[in-house]
């Protein structure tokens, strides 16, 4: 994973050719680039936080472009960014690719660079982008055409925003805070900025929108076969996301999971355990860290230990530990006192920009603290010891509600309305969830992966699963009970993180609603 920041400034006559490298451990709080704008300098610390293993600043005077990149190294060989491809292309890549041509020992950034190097006649940058499979964001500058390409994968699993100023300057960044006037990139749109004409084209897409089938199987005759197929693609999705974890430091090898104890994340944990058990570990059990976040809530009077998600996570963790004794499953109880919530609230509000509703904050701040991973392990005798997450790859169950009708508001919809709603949900998830979540989670120097949002899982789930199997996640509950022995967990009701962790409605303001705009000022520090 990497952080991306690009600035094209046609009127910057002070830019010099340079490449400055910053080693691991560099502090960026007061970093300034003397020949760059205040917006660029303001964004640098956000980008650096996303990639703690390496950062660099590259500037090319002839093109009037500056690139700041950071790297969280998860694939070998260690690859610095940005990448100069034969002085023809300049590449920034943030994400993970799962194209079958990429072996476990290959680096996906170098894979893209190789594709650009070996483009056949009649093929171009857009053809390379359309061939990518995985979760990613990118910028590519083509020297010969003087065009800048940037965008996100079709589902939008990595954040990216851009801004074109009245003076035709272009900024592209993974995260911006409230610096400048940025808008989020639409998932799957290939943005093309021509530095000669100063025109931005956003008409190309890397993938057509998904369409949910309206097929109904009233007798449930296909339930067994569909469940089998869904289990297979989900397992494959988890497998390729587990086997592509190769961190730079061995202590970062554990896999972490954002864990509420519900069916979505429990299915992911069970599948990870199945994949891990395929290998012979000679140095002890493989480790999975279940990150459960809970808040002290003065409005309800609840402490973190009292929240619904904490209680459920303890029970679900025990179930998983009993099912998979050959895996060291640690439940990390992340407690957030109210004063800690208040301390970080302005920062998280700024980090999730341009999202600015009460609901966005309650979700974002839960993921911020969960991914930070500072919590406790509780022994069998009830003794708690402080624990800091080691894993830097986090798995999330996001996407299950959108694919399988998990939200309460879907329960009583007639089939044709449910088809329309689920189609809208999966095609808009880049804006509704993913941009915000990636910004706040990646700030902790980790990467999040979404097995339910794998291209093949979405294709099967939208095109081949009858719509009546998607009421209250019927099909997923079938997979959980039949293939993963999660019978007890599979019957648990849906509970949104902000309510399960009690990060919503912290104060006694009875008129506050989730869609209300935040009143607090953003603090960029």
Swiss-Prot record:
One of its GO terms (cellular component) is cytoplasm. The lineage of its organism: Eukaryota, Fungi, Dikarya, Ascomycota, Saccharomycotina. It comes from Saccharomyces cerevisiae (strain ATCC 204508 / S288c) (Baker's yeast). One of its GO terms (molecular function) is asparagine synthase (glutamine-hydrolyzing) activity. Residues 503-525 are annotated as: Disordered. Present with 3750 molecules/cell in log phase SD medium. Keywords: Amino-acid biosynthesis, Asparagine biosynthesis, Cytoplasm, Glutamine amidotransferase. This is Asparagine synthetase domain-containing protein YML096W. GO terms for biological process: asparagine biosynthetic process. It comes from the Eukaryota. It is found in: Cytoplasm.
């Amino acid at each position: 994973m990497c952080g991306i920041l690009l600035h094209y400034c046609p009127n910057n006559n002070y830019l010099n050719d340079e490449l400055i490298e910053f080693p691991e451990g560099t502090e960026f709080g007061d970093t300034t680039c003397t020949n760059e704008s205040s917006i660029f300098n303001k964004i640098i610390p956000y980008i650096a936080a996303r990639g703690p293993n390496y950062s660099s600043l590259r500037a090319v005077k002839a093109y009037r472009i500056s690139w700041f990149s950071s790297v969280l190294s998860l694939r070998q060989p260690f690859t610095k960014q940005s990448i100069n491809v034969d002085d023809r292309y300049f590449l920034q890549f943030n994400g993970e690719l799962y194209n079958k041509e990429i072996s476990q020992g290959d680096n996906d950034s170098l894979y893209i660079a190789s594709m650009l190097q070996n483009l056949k006649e009649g093929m171009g940058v857009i053809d390379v982008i359309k061939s990518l499979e995985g979760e990613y964001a990118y910028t590519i500058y083509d020297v010969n055409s003087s065009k800048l390409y940037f965008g996100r994968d079709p589902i939008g699993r990595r954040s990216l925003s851009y801004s074109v100023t009245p003076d035709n300057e272009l900024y592209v960044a993974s995260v911006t805070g409230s610096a400048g006037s940025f808008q989020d990139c639409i998932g799957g749109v290939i943005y093309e900025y021509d530095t000669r004409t100063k025109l931005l084209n956003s008409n190309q897409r890397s993938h057509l929108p998904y369409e949910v089938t309206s097929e109904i199987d009233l007798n449930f005759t296909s339930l067994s076969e569909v469940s089998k197929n869904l289990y297979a693609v989900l397992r494959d999705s988890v497998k390729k996301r587990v086997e592509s974890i190769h961190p730079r430091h061995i202590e970062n090898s554990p896999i972490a999971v954002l864990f509420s104890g519900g069916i979505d994340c429990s299915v992911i944990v069970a599948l990870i355990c199945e994949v891990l058990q395929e290998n012979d570990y000679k140095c002890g059990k493989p480790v999975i860290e279940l990150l459960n976040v809970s808040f002290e809530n003065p409005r309800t009077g609840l402490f973190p230990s009292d929240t619904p998600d904490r209680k459920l996570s303890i029970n679900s963790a025990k179930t998983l530990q009993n099912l998979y004794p050959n895996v060291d499953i640690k439940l990390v109880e992340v407690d957030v006192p109210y004063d800690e919530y208040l301390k970080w609230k302005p920062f998280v509000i700024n980090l999730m920009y341009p999202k600015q509703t009460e609901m966005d904050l309650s979700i974002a701040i839960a993921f911020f603290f969960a991914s930070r991973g500072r919590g406790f392990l509780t022994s069998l005798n009830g003794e708690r010891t402080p624990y800091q997450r080691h894993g830097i790859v986090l798995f999330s169950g996001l996407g299950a509600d959108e694919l399988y009708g998990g939200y309460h508001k879907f329960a009583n919809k007639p089939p044709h309305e449910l088809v329309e709603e689920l189609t809208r949900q999966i095609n808009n998830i880049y804006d509704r969830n993913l941009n915000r979540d990636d910004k706040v989670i990646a700030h902790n120097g980790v990467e999040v992966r979404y097995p339910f949002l794998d291209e093949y899982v979405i294709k099967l789930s939208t095109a081949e699963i009858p719509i009546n199997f998607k009421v209250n996640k019927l099909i997923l509950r079938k997979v959980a009970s039949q293939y993963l022995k999660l019978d007890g967990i599979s019957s648990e009701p849906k509970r949104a993180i902000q309510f399960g962790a009690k990060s919503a409605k912290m104060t006694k303001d009875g008129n506050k609603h989730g869609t209300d705009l935040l009143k607090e000022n953003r603090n960029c520090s």
